[in-house]
Every structure is written in structure tokens, then in C-alpha cells.
């Protein structure tokens, strides 16, 4: 075993000491499961398909229950070579559950053969499994028996094949040339026609004829290429069907064709307002695979850039929410403030919206001279501006009347639908990953987590974001005053790009540098996982390495996906005007939903 392999192996854990493993074995027997050792930081348990629902129900009813289905997706295992000790599987499905009371997770996995891809739907236990199962079916082909509406979600209705299978082409050049004939165009248009009967909706009752209205996919209040079909009785929303996927670019498939290093720019585009925030979970997950511990200076720099982008995103969210309610002026103020943030970001990284600046083992380069003055000027400017936003718009009686009590829900509903971020904290649940599960040194910062009073409505959600802005300014102040000295890269063989000085010794070091930069670093075969508190909720990367220069499987869990699935539950019985306010209060962009 090399030193590098030994360092990586020390991070691999089976979590047999986790109390939930004992609880499961006491209930189902010591031989009922296969526990997988990974670097996810989470117990990973392979469950028999026949026991899946029983195990899920058991976990949900424990004294300190696993109350949230955080993620659900699949993997094509057929080409995976490093599977020692795991159940035989052509495909697998994983279920990631969170216990808020324990502040712990568990991941259940089910092995499937290519000839039998059926398993029971999880929607009977967790309603938010609906969209996750639809996406897993269309990407891999697993059939979830009992699912209420197992149809395509991200891909067009006419699409054939399952794109995340290993035998499905990954590049446009592997397909035949695209041709849009008149017949194909007519077929695509017909496929987009909404048929209420397909969704269990009635066109009329004895006394009422319902109207069906398309909002989007090109509408300013839909905040992107997003379509929602409304079933209306007058102006009252009887039901609705969100239609997503117009922004889907195959981000997870791209992860299988890019090196660990060259995939970093793609992470910026997942939630395109978040910039470096998007890079954080990816590089942390890769560093777990590699066994890299970064210097303190790197941690603080990463936190500083993340909080700058958090403020930038929140400013746009707050101002566009106010605009959706009917006031235009704050948007122009917000863009002035965001320009100041971009000036700081550009001076540090060289780019503005999508810096692609974090690196495996560090950051691209050290902080430039004068960065502290730019940040100081911004910190002197921003608090007064926040006060003006609050005084001029957010305390406005019309805005309060339009948003308070609108699209309201409690803690149980938020957990049932996988809500995170301000949407969850507005219900009174104090769960911010920066505090609950600190990463990148957040445990060293002094800041508060704003929490609501028990009900998450449009007004509470936006006001929590205002207070989050103030807390981000506190964190930035501490970054400015306590920036550590030291290197901006870890001294580790898998740090990418490696330190340039090593290339100047002899031909061997030059070759090593060349291979790592051109082909990319080779990560140890294992699995890793990292969640962070992103701008819109919890974002996570679940990476599987098969000992190659590229990821075997890249799973990206975004908060906006879960939040849009919840829309029908939140707005049934509301007016169309209330829906517009609710869409503005969610804080989403479609790239974050569709990936």
C-alpha cells in the first residue's frame, strides 16, 4: 500500500458504530443487510428489495426519526470494477434519509439486475419521492410499482432511451445529425399538449367548467424556462402541474466525460447565480476521495468567496421578489450593490459570475494586493443599503398584505417535500449546514442562523433572507480581520494543478506534472459525499470513483428541484396572483432545477 492509498483508506468508514445500524440489526437481524464502507461520512446500507418499504417505514418511526427523503437516484453498476464485498448488481437505487433530531443521515441501496428493474414506489412513505423516481426511471429505466404518474420529467415526452446508462452516448458527435422535419415538429408540438385526464384532472363538474392556463415557459414571473399548467375555477387555483426540463443540459452525464479537475467550470452553471458556492461541495467531495486536508488560509478564502456570492444571490432574490409584488425601484438599487460585489470577485478571481476558481486542494492563486481594501469598502457600504431596502419596501403595508400568510406551510410539510434553506428554517426548524455540519472551517466563525416562528409563508421566507444577508456580512468581516497566513494550495500529490516548482527539478517531475494537468489526477476508487448550505438551500455532490481520471457517477442534488415539486401543495385554493408571489418567494433558477 502506497502512502497515498494509506492516507485515503484511513478516511473509509463503514459506520458500524452508528446507533442506527444497531437499531436496524436489532429489528431485522444481523445478516439482513450489507454495510458498505465509503468516504461519504454516512452509513451506507444495502437492503433487499422486498424489505425496502419496511425498512423505510421503520426508520421514519424511530424515536428520533429519519423524517426527510433528501435524495433518491440510481447508478449503472455494469462497468464498475471496484465492487468487492457488495451485492451483485447491474443497477442500483439509493435513498438518502436525514434525521433532524439526530443530525445524522443514512443511505439505503437496493441492487437490481438488468432483467428485473422493478421496485416499489417510495411515495407511500415520502411524497417527494415522486419527482425523484420519475427522473430515476427516465435516466436509468427502473420501474417504480405503484407510482402515481411515472412519466418523463426532464426529457421531452418523445425521448427514447435512458441517458445515464453507460451504453448511452455522451457526446453529440455520437448521434446521427439532428433533423427537424415537419412530421417531427408536429409530433413534438402534439406531445406538449396538456391533457388534464392524464393527470387525474376533470375538465368540468356538474356546476363548473374549469379553465386550463399555461403560465410559461416564457413568462417573467416564472423566473426562467419553466411552465406550470393551472386548473382554474375563476381565479382560484384548483390544481396545477409544474413542467420542468427546458433547461436540462445533462450535467451529471458530463461528469463522466470530464476529468476531476476539468469538471469544476461545469459546477458554476448548476445554480448560475451562486458562483463559487457551487464549486464548494464538488471540490470538498473530491478532496474526501483524495484524502486532502487544505491549509487554513484556503478554508477562509473559500468561505469569503462563498459568502460574497451568497449576498449577491440574496440581493437579486429580494429585489425580484419585491418586483413580483409590484415595486420596481429596488431591482435597480440591487444591481448597483451587486456590481460592487462583482468588482471584489473579479479583482480576486479574474472573473465575475462564473469564476471556476476553487481547485482540488486549494484555490487557483493567492489573494491579490488590495483585496482587503475592496472588501472593506463593500462592508462599509452594504449595511446601510440593507436598512434602506427594509424600510422602503419590505415594511410596506401593501407588500406585507400580498405576502403574509400566502403559500403557508408548517414543519411537517416542509420535511415531507424535502424543503431546505430558508423554506425549512421559516417553519422553526434550526437546520443550517454551516452550523449543524460545519465545513471549510465554518465552525470558527461567529454568526447566527435566522429561524422563523413556525409557519413558512412568502413574507417570512424573504425576511429570513434579509437577516441571512446581515449574517453573511458578519462572516465577511471576520474573514477580513482574521485571514490566516500560509499557502493557497495543499502539499499533496493529488492537488491539481500541482505546485509549479516541482516541474523544475528533473524530467520525472515534469512528466508527472504534465500527466496530472492533461489527463487529470487519478482518484482512489470509493464514494464520497458533501452537502453545503448553498444560496437556495442544501446542495450536495455524491461522487463515485472507480479509480480513474474521471468520475464513474456524479450525482448532483439541488434545493430548487425539491422546492418546485412542492408548488401544487402550497398553492391549491389560492389565487393566480398569490402563485406569482409564491414563485417569487421560493428563490430558484431553472438551471438549479434541471441541471
Curated annotation (Swiss-Prot):
List its EC numbers.
7.1.1.-
GO function term, MF aspect, one: quinone binding
Renumbered to this chain, region (NADH dehydrogenase I subunit D) spans 209-595
The protein's annotated catalytic reaction(s) are: a quinone + NADH + 5 H(+)(in) = a quinol + NAD(+) + 4 H(+)(out)
Membrane topology note: Peripheral membrane protein
Chief location of this protein within or outside the cell: membrane
What EC class does the entry list? translocase
An example Gene Ontology CC term for this record: NADH dehydrogenase complex
Map out region (NADH dehydrogenase I subunit C) in residue numbers. Answer: 1-185
Function, as annotated, reads:
NDH-1 shuttles electrons from NADH, via FMN and iron-sulfur (Fe-S) centers, to quinones in the respiratory chain. The immediate electron acceptor for the enzyme in this species is believed to be ubiquinone. Couples the redox reaction to proton translocation (for every two electrons transferred, four hydrogen ions are translocated across the cytoplasmic membrane), and thus conserves the redox energy in a proton gradient.
Q: How does it assemble?
A: NDH-1 is composed of 13 different subunits. Subunits NuoB, CD, E, F, and G constitute the peripheral sector of the complex.
| UniProt name for this protein | NADH-quinone oxidoreductase subunit C/D
Amino acid at each position: 500500500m502506497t502512502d497515498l492509498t494509506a492516507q485515503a483508506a484511513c478516511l473509509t468508514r463503514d459506520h458500524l458504530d452508528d446507533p442506527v445500524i444497531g437499531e436496524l440489526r436489532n429489528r431485522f437481524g444481523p445478516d439482513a443487510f450489507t454495510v458498505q464502507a465509503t468516504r461519504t461520512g454516512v452509513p451506507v446500507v444495502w437492503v433487499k428489495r422486498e424489505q425496502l418499504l419496511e425498512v423505510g417505514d421503520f426508520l421514519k418511526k424511530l424515536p428520533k426519526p429519519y423524517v426527510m427523503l433528501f435524495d433518491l437516484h440510481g447508478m449503472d453498476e455494469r462497468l464498475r470494477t471496484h465492487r468487492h464485498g457488495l451485492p451483485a448488481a447491474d443497477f442500483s437505487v439509493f435513498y438518502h434519509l436525514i434525521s433532524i433530531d439526530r443530525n445524522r443521515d443514512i443511505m439505503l441501496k437496493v441492487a437490481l439486475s438488468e432483467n428485473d428493474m422493478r421496485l416499489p414506489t417510495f411515495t407511500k412513505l415520502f411524497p417527494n419521492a415522486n419527482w425523484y423516481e420519475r427522473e430515476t426511471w427516465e435516466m436509468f429505466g427502473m420501474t417504480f410499482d405503484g407510482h402515481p404518474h411515472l412519466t418523463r420529467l426532464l426529457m421531452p415526452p418523445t425521448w427514447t432511451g435512458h441517458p445515464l446508462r453507460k451504453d448511452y452516448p455522451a457526446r453529440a458527435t455520437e448521434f446521427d445529425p439532428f433533423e427537424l422535419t415537419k412530421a417531427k415538429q408536429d409530433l413534438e408540438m402534439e406531445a406538449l399538449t396538456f391533457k388534464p385526464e392524464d393527470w387525474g384532472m376533470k375538465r368540468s363538474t356538474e356546476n363548473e367548467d374549469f379553465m386550463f392556463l399555461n403560465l410559461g415557459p416564457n413568462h417573467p414571473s416564472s423566473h426562467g424556462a419553466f411552465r406550470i399548467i393551472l386548473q382554474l375555477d375563476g381565479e382560484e387555483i384548483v390544481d396545477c402541474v409544474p413542467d420542468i426540463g427546458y433547461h436540462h443540459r445533462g450535467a451529471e452525464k458530463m461528469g463522466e466525460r470530464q476529468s476531476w479537475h476539468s469538471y469544476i467550470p461545469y459546477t458554476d452553471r448548476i445554480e448560475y447565480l451562486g458562483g463559487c458556492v457551487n464549486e464548494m461541495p464538488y471540490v470538498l467531495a473530491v478532496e474526501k476521495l483524495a484524502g486532502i486536508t487544505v491549509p487554513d488560509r484556503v478554508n477562509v478564502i473559500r468561505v469569503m468567496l462563498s459568502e460574497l456570492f451568497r449576498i449577491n444571490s440574496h440581493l437579486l432574490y429580494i429585489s425580484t421578489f419585491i418586483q413580483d409584488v409590484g415595486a420596481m425601484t429596488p431591482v435597480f438599487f440591487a444591481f448597483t450593490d451587486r456590481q460592487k460585489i462583482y468588482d471584489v470577485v473579479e479583482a480576486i478571481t479574474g472573473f465575475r459570475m462564473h469564476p471556476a476558481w476553487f481547485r482540488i486542494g486549494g484555490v487557483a492563486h493567492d489573494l491579490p494586493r488590495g483585496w482587503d481594501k475592496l472588501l472593506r469598502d463593500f462592508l462599509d457600504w452594504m449595511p446601510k443599503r440593507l436598512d434602506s431596502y427594509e424600510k422602503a419596501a419590505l415594511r410596506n403595508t401593501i407588500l406585507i398584505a400580498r405576502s403574509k400568510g400566502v403559500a403557508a406551510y408548517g414543519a411537517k410539510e416542509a420535511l415531507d417535500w424535502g424543503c431546505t434553506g430558508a423554506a425549512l428554517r421559516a417553519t422553526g426548524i434550526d437546520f443550517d449546514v454551516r452550523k449543524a455540519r460545519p465545513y471549510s472551517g465554518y465552525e470558527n466563525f461567529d454568526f447566527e442562523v435566522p429561524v422563523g416562528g413556525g409557519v413558512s409563508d412568502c413574507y417570512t421566507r424573504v425576511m429570513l433572507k434579509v437577516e441571512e444577508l446581515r449574517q453573511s456580512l458578519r462572516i465577511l468581516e471576520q474573514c477580513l480581520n482574521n485571514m490566516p497566513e500560509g499557502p493557497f494550495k495543499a502539499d499533496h500529490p493529488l492537488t491539481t494543478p500541482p505546485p509549479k516548482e516541482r516541474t523544475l527539478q528533473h524530467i520525472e517531475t515534469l512528466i508527472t506534472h504534465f500527466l496530472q494537468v492533461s489527463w487529470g489526477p487519478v482518484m482512489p476508487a470509493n464514494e464520497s459525499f458533501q452537502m453545503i448550505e448553498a444560496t437556495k438551500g442544501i446542495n450536495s455532490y455524491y461522487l463515485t470513483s472507480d479509480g480513474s481520471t474521471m468520475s464513474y457517477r456524479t450525482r448532483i442534488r439541488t434545493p430548487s428541484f425539491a422546492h418546485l415539486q412542492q408548488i401544487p401543495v402550497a398553492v391549491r385554493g389560492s389565487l393566480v396572483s398569490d402563485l406569482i408571489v409564491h414563485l417569487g418567494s421560493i428563490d430558484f433558477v431553472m438551471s438549479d432545477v434541471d441541471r
